[in-house]
């Protein structure tokens, strides 16, 4: 019968080596000690013997509260997950003959998205005869590029895909 695999470091009776490098509950190095003696020292202060570095010879063990160690490990993992920022791609849709005020509103939105650390995909949709004036769309995207040059860099240059011209910018 095989023992079930526990999560986390080995502790107390799970440590099966004859001797360990011991660090006491105050963080002082005690040297190489017999495992049974280390277990007795841990029991004396009411704490657990926990294997910190298992792949050394002999393994490094520390006298510490196992519940507290698991709690701190979970807390660190949660903190790391919280700090991770998922970069989203926000999309701004425009037409080639956009009005001045509409352009300014779209530009404010682009600035807000870049300020939040997101990438922005600017899409120009051409309808009907507008396809004959792709140069207007390219000029508009160049204008967006110039207006956002101090806060963003171009990740994907303007390119035409079907009836749409698109460009992707990212925060600097």
From Swiss-Prot:
UniProt entry keywords in alphabetical sequence: Cytoplasm, Initiation factor, Protein biosynthesis
Q: Name any one GO molecular function.
A: translation initiation factor activity
Question: Quick check: keyword Protein biosynthesis in the entry?
Answer: yes
GO cellular component entries: cytosol; membrane
UniProt cross-references to InterPro entries, sorted A to Z = T_IF-3_C_sf, T_IF-3_N_sf, Translation_initiation_fac_3, Translation_initiation_fac_3_C, Translation_initiation_fac_3_N
Question: According to its UniProt entry, what is the function of this protein?
Answer: IF-3 binds to the 30S ribosomal subunit and shifts the equilibrium between 70S ribosomes and their 50S and 30S subunits in favor of the free subunits, thus enhancing the availability of 30S subunits on which protein synthesis initiation begins.
Name the UniProt record assigns to this protein = Translation initiation factor IF-3
Origin organism is Bartonella quintana (strain Toulouse) (Rochalimaea quintana)
